[in-house]
Design a protein with these regions (language model features):
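N-terminal acidic, proline/glycine-rich, low-complexity intrinsically disordered segments
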Residues: 1-11
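Serine/proline-rich low-complexity intrinsically disordered segments, especially terminal tails, linkers
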Residues: 12-14, 19, 23, 61, ...
Length: 522
């Protein structure tokens, strides 16, 4: 079982209450961020623009970028005794990708031919799980190798955090960061720390990228009347303004993110070794893939450009909306797979497959109507959101096609990636080296893995998945227990049939989180 290190400074630094009804001024959650302007972020981000060309035509959409080499002060506590092994690394994080929406993870409906092919050349982890959710807590885990539990707060890296990029930079590895996941660069966020260069592709979702012309766009033309509300209207109007220059597939965010990654590789191929971190917001909402991908799942949609994203009230969604929503998401997944496939082809053409480790994963999944839930829902903390795809391709062909069934967690990413690059001297992390499962050195690194999303927490092992509210009375869809031996898809709550198993898992969850959680209430 993973040894949990103390990393709860954010909840105890100033004696903050764990009661979510007592809010502190300095914390930023996703909902509050959406309503804030990016104007207050300072001039550091706007160091320059790179005009990108697509098919011989200069893109109208800028990519903000910067070089932090002269401003980033590396933490003194990073040792430098290890010598990197000269392998490169490319990490691809694609937001909100359900594991069961990949052919290599068992989907027969959703088309993902490029990642399916990639998986055949790679190690595929069948039991990878998120730790802190949603977007920003997950990135804190990925970039530091440290647990964020028992909290799962929407806040930047702490000054005391040491990031993956900072460790690599200290060891002489060139680091690059490309993201259209705008939360990385939101007010007070700092996830570009330690990168020699970074690029922010503007305009995703509700990024306050453009402010007009508001009167030109009417979200009601893109959604059923029964789904409309003022908040949804405001969010989708922002998105329509952000994408007003979109003319062809090359203008979509997913395409532009992967194109920016190709450009970076061409520019840095001689900076060996290097690490490129590509963080794509797709297939996150809004789900509006190009028409040719949407038509793979249905011939006709209710609207020429049907927009589905945050702001919809779940109570307004009708049963006849769900098939359309599922097809919109499937199309977004297939389009994202296509874009990643183009990037993988470029990597191969550049001759990088023989000396580069390539990682594909996500932060979490989403709900598509399960138990009445649509979009990621804390109160239904099941595999739809906690189970994540994780595929790692190593140049050593002995690892091609391996499937690892042992439990792994998001907190294991950095403790695995560093040794893969030959860096063994940095140890201040909470996770384990999951590559030992691939080499056969160990058969297991965790007995249980844990996830927290808002006020809900889960414990997962090879036999059971259990979740409940860990801070209050709102049960959500819990307490919930799934029997994974007989219900791999987590469709049937058996908490009343196996109360003793539920109590045992509840106690383990409390012990791991090191907080008092509500008792099991049946």
């Amino acid at each position: 079982m993973m040894k949990q290190k103390a990393n709860v400074k954010s909840m105890s630094k100033e004696g903050e209450s764990l009661d979510t009804s007592k809010k502190t001024n300095h914390l930023i959650n996703r909902r509050n961020f959406i309503g804030k302007t990016i104007a207050g972020t300072g001039a550091l981000w706007l160091l320059g623009t790179n005009a990108k060309k697509t098919e011989g035509k200069e893109s109208k959409m800028p990519i903000w970028s910067g070089d932090l080499k002269t401003t980033a002060k590396l933490p003194a506590q990073i040792p430098q005794t290890s010598k990197p092994n000269k392998l490169n690394m490319i990490i691809i994080i694609a937001d909100t990708w359900r594991a069961d929406h990949l052919g290599c993870y068992g989907s027969t409906r959703v088309k993902t031919p490029y990642l399916d092919k990639f998986a055949k050349e790679s190690v595929l982890f069948t039991n990878a799980n998120a730790e802190g959710l949603p977007t920003i807590p997950c990135r804190r885990v990925y970039h530091t190798g440290r647990s964020v539990l028992p909290e799962s707060r929407w806040e930047p890296l702490d000054k005391s955090d040491v990031t993956f990029a900072e460790v690599l930079q200290k060891h002489g590895i060139t680091t690059g960061f490309i993201a259209d996941t705008y939360h990385h660069f939101a007010p007070n966020m700092n996830f570009h720390r330690g990168f020699d260069s970074w690029q922010w592709i503007r305009g995703q979702e509700f990024d306050r990228y453009k402010s007009g012309p508001k009167e030109k766009y009417d979200p009601k033309k893109h959604m059923p009347e029964h789904l409309w509300n003022e908040n949804y209207d405001r969010n989708m109007r922002q998105y329509l303004m952000n994408t007003q220059d979109r003319e062809k597939d090359e203008d979509y965010f997913c395409t532009r993110s992967c194109r920016a990654a190709m450009d970076w590789l061409e520019q840095n191929i001689n900076n060996k070794p290097f690490m490129l971190w590509l963080d794509m917001f797709d297939p996150h909402e809004p789900w509006d893939a190009p028409a040719r991908f949407q038509k793979m799942y249905r011939d006709k949609y209710p609207y020429e450009r049907y927009l589905f994203g945050y702001g919809v009230r779940v109570k307004d969604i009708r049963s006849d909306d769900l098939p359309v929503i599922r097809d919109l998401y499937a199309a977004e997944v297939t389009f994202s797979d296509y874009c990643i496939g183009r990037l993988l082809k470029k990597i191969e053409e550049m001759g990088l497959m023989d000396n580069t480790i390539i990682v594909f994963s996500t932060d979490h999944g989403t709900h598509l109507g399960e138990e009445g839930c649509v979009q990621k829902t804390p109160g239904l903390l099941n595999a739809c959101v906690t189970h994540i795809p994780l595929i790692i391709r190593h140049p050593d062909e002995r690892f091609a096609g391996k499937r690892i069934d042992g439990l792994v967690s998001a907190v294991d990413f950095m403790p695995t990636f560093l040794p893969l690059l030959g860096i063994e001297d940095y140890k201040n992390m909470d996770g384990e080296n999951m590559w030992k499962l691939a080499t056969g050195d160990v058969s297991s690194i965790h007995d249980d893995v844990y996830t927290v999303f808002d006020v809900f927490g889960s414990i997962h092992n090879l036999d059971w998945h259990y979740f409940q509210n860990i801070k209050g009375d709102d049960p959500g869809k819990g307490p919930c227990l799934y029997d994974l031996k007989n219900d791999r898809g987590q469709t049937r709550n058996v908490v009343r049939e196996f109360p003793e198993a539920a109590k045992d898992l509840r106690n383990k969850l409390q012990n791991h989180l090191k907080i008092e959680i509500p008792p099991l209430r049946l």
